[in-house]
């Protein structure tokens, strides 16, 4: 009887250690994934765009893409890039 109880307690201790190791590994993976996402986000923010995309705010110093034109669209109170009814050539 003592051996059975000792075996059960030992098995529970082993499962607790394995569970703790799994949680630590999962947390490290989660932190690594979060770090990778922030790294990608920072890299995309530093890239300069050549032109503003559809419905992007535009001014003289921020031109729209070729198939868009900077125009005023009610009820928006600032100029945005709107479609000029042409398609970009490939």
UniProtKB/Swiss-Prot annotation:
| Superkingdom, natural source | Eukaryota
Keyword terms of this UniProt record = Disulfide bond, Ion channel impairing toxin, Knottin, Secreted, Signal, Toxin
Q: What is its main location?
A: secreted
Q: Which GO terms describe its molecular function?
A: ion channel inhibitor activity; toxin activity
Positions of the propeptide removed during maturation:
20-50
Where is the protein localized? Secreted
Paired cysteines (S-S): 51-65, 58-70, 64-81
So what family is this one in? Belongs to the neurotoxin 10 (Hwtx-1) family. 13 (Hntx-13) subfamily.
User: Briefly, what is this protein's role?
Assistant: Ion channel inhibitor.
What protein name does the entry list?
U7-theraphotoxin-Hhn1i
| Source species of the chain | Cyriopagopus hainanus (Chinese bird spider)
């Amino acid at each position: 009887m003592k051996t059975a109880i000792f075996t059960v307690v030992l098995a529970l201790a082993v499962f607790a250690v394995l569970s703790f190791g799994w949680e630590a590994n999962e947390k490290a993976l989660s932190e690594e994934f979060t770090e990778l996402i922030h790294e990608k986000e920072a890299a995309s923010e530093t890239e300069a765009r050549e032109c503003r995309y559809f419905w992007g705010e535009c001014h003289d110093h921020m031109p729209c893409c070729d198939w868009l034109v900077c125009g005023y669209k009610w009820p928006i109170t600032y100029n945005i890039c709107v479609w000029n009814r042409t398609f970009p050539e490939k």
